[in-house]
Amino acid sequence: MFVVAHGFTGAVDRPHVRRVARALTRYGAVVTFSFRGHGASGGRSTVGDREVLDLAAAVRWARELGHARVGTVGFSMGGSVALRHAALYEEATDAVVSVSAPARWYYRGTAPMRRLHWLVTRPEGRVVSRYGFRTRIHHRDWDPVPLSPVEAVPKIAPTPLLIVHGDADGYFPVDHPRMLAAAAADQGELWLEPGMGHAEHAASDELLGRIGEWVVGRAG
């Protein structure tokens, strides 16, 4: 069973999220959902903080459906959420895949991330996000600041961990996945994909197939 955690401004009905789900159905059952504040889901996005509760609920539901083995596959924001979920909920998942995730919070080193920070932190940006991207963002700052992805990674072991990142990612350069891999040490695996951009849009069917095979091989 795969539980797919989409990226920021994604949603269960977005074509790129549906494509990911279809590709993974070749390897097992798939649960998809929309994070809070995204698409038709209620509430407001906290951009990776309380979304860990949403993923936990989806994983619990997958278990209640009778699936004994569950792997989480997260993209960008969803990738950071998958890392924190695995660190905070002991034995919640049997394998974790994080694709295009940041290693640290508040990164503004690329133009796309500076635009994203404008969407999140400015009232006019949140209006654009609501009506342009169907994503409603909470106006409050994080308090407390959640565990960062790189801090979460060492707490995931012994659950198998796969970190996937494109070397042409326009949001987070390759020092992010390398930081995550270093934090995982020999408990994680890094795939640095040549020519790949960011998150679901950039994940080829071939890559999704390899991810599906990896999860099946590790989670059983």
Where are these regions (language model features)?
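Hydrolase active-site cap/lid region
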Residues: 90-141
